[in-house]
Regions:
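Short Cys/His-rich local motifs and their 1-3 flanking residues in nucleic-acid-associated proteins
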Residues: 126
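Short cysteine/histidine-rich zinc-coordinating motifs and their immediately flanking basic loops
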Residues: 133-139
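Short functional micro-motifs and their immediate structural scaffolds
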Residues: 129
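Short, cysteine/histidine-rich loop/knuckle motifs that typically chelate Zn2+
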Residues: 123
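Flexible coil segments in periplasmic/lumen-exposed cytochrome c-class electron-transfer proteins
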Residues: 3-120, 155-199
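Terminal helix-turn-helix DNA-binding modules in bacterial transcription factors
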Residues: 149
Length: 199
């Protein structure tokens, strides 16, 4: 579930980040923070998913209507394969297929801590999960990204400035818990007033 270093752009992105100065990183962060948020992931709970192939680090729906059981996984596919794979349209949305019931289970963990299993996410990520001070927002993010971050923090593969604060939060989470949290947070979008102000 962690970041896959065999994926070509993982190592390229690591090298780019290592070569950046502090000023370049700050400038990049400010640029990306200034981009108006637009929803691009739609979470769909289901028992079956389209059969897919992997290309360029993406799951892409096969031609036809073949399906398979989802099992305990989230499958993210472009809403429009040609727009995403061929035209590289940055506004082409994704569908995140998740197991039935995962959003509700994730809400119990995120909103209430799952009866002591973890910490309420709003404590650090803000009441709408949009971030709080230097702590990033997690609402509306790719569920694959969220699951990878949780897993990497739990396994000790992340060493960022704030990672130590997350260690007790992720310590007791199972892979299914991480899947459920990822499904729930992906299903959340910023409030309408936050969208209009560009937050």
């Amino acid at each position: 579930m962690g970041a896959d270093t065999r994926k070509a752009n993982t190592n390229i992105m690591i090298q780019i980040a290592k070569a950046m100065t502090d000023d370049e990183m700050k400038s990049s962060a400010q640029y990306f923070a200034s981009i108006k948020w637009t929803p691009w992931i739609k979470v769909v709970e289901t028992n079956t998913v389209p059969k897919t192939r992997i290309a360029g680090g993406l799951f892409l729906k096969l031609e036809g209507n073949e399906t398979e059981p989802i099992g305990q996984r989230i499958i993210e596919v472009p809403e429009n394969t040609e727009e995403t794979e061929v035209l590289r349209n940055p506004r082409s949305g994704f569908i995140a297929y998740a197991p039935v019931g995962s959003v509700k289970k994730g809400e119990a963990l995120v909103a209430a801590g799952g009866n002591g299993k973890t910490t309420q996410c709003a404590v650090c990520h803000g009441p709408d999960l949009l971030g709080l001070g230097p702590v990033p927002g997690i609402a509306g993010r790719s569920p694959s990204y969220i699951a990878r971050q949780l897993y990497d923090m739990q396994q000790g593969a992340r060493h960022g400035l704030w990672t130590d604060l997350m260690k007790p939060v992720v310590a007791k989470l199972t892979p299914e818990d991480m899947l459920n949290i990822a499904a729930y947070t992906a299903s959340r979008g910023p409030r309408a007033d936050a969208r209009q102000s560009g937050q």
